[in-house]
């Protein structure tokens, strides 16, 4: 039987270290490949940072009035992959529709933003978005286990 590990934290940057620790502890129980662990942990860190900074804050330091300000992380192992589901109550936003940054432009001429989502895409094998019926978001990150 698969075990789903769940962790709910306040949507605050000060909890990123605890989130990384949670992901590391759970994933290490199923896959000890260092690159796999690093990639998945960094992808979760980037996605959660985006949720906190862009979803729950109007501008730096100013939280949204609505929503309960939490993020729930569910990690579910499968035979060939690990899936991480991030649920929040921030305004709905589909990151899978976000265009990739324009790398043909010098960095000083690029439109700001989008690097975190790009990094999450690059570090995972699949990223899926679903708006939650009662409001909020669900982002599923899928990472295939390395071949032996």
Please annotate each region the language model reported.
Residues 1-6, 52-148:
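Conserved beta-strand-loop-beta-strand hairpin that lines the nucleotide-binding pocket
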Residues 2-34:
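Helix-loop-beta hinge of the Bergerat
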Residues 13, 17, 46, 97, ...:
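Solvent-exposed, flexible loop/coil residues
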Residues 23-45, 109-111:
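Conserved short strand/loop->alpha-helix "switch" segment adjacent to the catalytic nucleotide/phosphoryl-transfer site
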Residues 47, 51:
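Hydrophobic residues in the alpha-helical elements that line and stabilize the ATP-binding pocket
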């Amino acid at each position: 039987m698969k075990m789903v590990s769940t962790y709910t934290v306040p949507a605050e940057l000060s909890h990123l270290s605890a989130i990384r620790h949670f992901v590391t502890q759970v994933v290490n129980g199923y896959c000890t490949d260092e690159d796999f662990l690093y990639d998945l942990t960094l992808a979760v860190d980037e996605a959660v940072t985006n949720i906190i900074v862009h979803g729950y804050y109007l501008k730096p330091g100013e939280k949204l009035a609505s929503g309960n300000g939490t993020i729930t992380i569910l990690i579910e192992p499968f035979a060939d992959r690990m899936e991480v589901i991030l649920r929040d109550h921030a305004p709905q936003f589909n990151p899978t529709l976000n265009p990739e940054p324009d790398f043909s432009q010098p960095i000083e001429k690029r439109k700001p933003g989008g690097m975190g989502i790009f990094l999450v895409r690059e570090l995972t094998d699949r990223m899926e978005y679903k708006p939650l019926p009662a409001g909020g978001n669900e982002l599923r990150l899928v990472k295939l286990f390395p071949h032996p």
